[in-house]
Amino acid sequence: MNYALDALWWKLTSQPVRDLASLLTAPPLWQSGCELGVRELLGERGFRYLLALDADPAPLTEHLTRRAPFGHRLGIYAEELLAFWFANAPHAELLAHNLTVSGSDGNTQGAADFVARLNGKPYHIELTCKYYGGGTGRLEDMRGLDPKDTLLGKAAKLTAQLGLPHTSDGIRTLRQHGLPLDVKPVSIVRGIGFFPHGFHAFEPPLNPYGWRGIYIQDWAEYGFKRQEVRYHLLDRMAYLAPARVAETETLNATEIRRIDQGLIAVLECRPDGFWHEIERIMKAV
């Protein structure tokens, strides 16, 4: 699936609102077995609320300003976007954020990203946003730009995190904070899987309908068949949503070939005068 082509991206213009929308509506990169669905995340009035935020993003931008700086840590930024949503969306109530779970010896066991009510139901919610690629498409080869960051490792860690509030230490922590004990563990797994051109043999738990991009190690693998497109090297903090940039922020095919490593948005110009992402590339080394 090329999530960048969703009609939503023709409408939203505020960058933080676009980032928030991607967390709420993108397909999971892999299937944890307990995904929190888009319907639950958005609620009945969530899409209208997103449009209202896009028209006046001040409440969201002010929230982010209070929480900044994020130290170039995409995960912290993404958590703050969702914390705003759970605290302000019409159907949501934020009960706890980064709830530390400690053992009886005082040692930290971990932390729950969120405890929140959605439509009155209590959830323990874990968020992860990852960008993995590999030249074979096999699970064991799926890695981030940092080769130590692997899909299999992160998936295992997520499973452990989801079980945390249901341990004896987790239950005690929930009780100490006056939180519901019957929280349902759910995940929000976002990001992009990058595969070689024409690859379709997705292994579980990869989501065959996830947001996909192109994986290359040499620019000669890409082809550059489309003459009308331009390119943009994405800053790490701009990974979440499809890019929407001014022409001054774009590069041509010759310039982009000088990039050794990174995530690159392939862009087309749309009637609003901005260049919009239509495909994403992971250039690895």
Predicted regions and their residues:
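Intrinsically disordered, low-complexity Ser/Thr/Pro/Gly-rich regulatory segments
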Residues: M1-V285
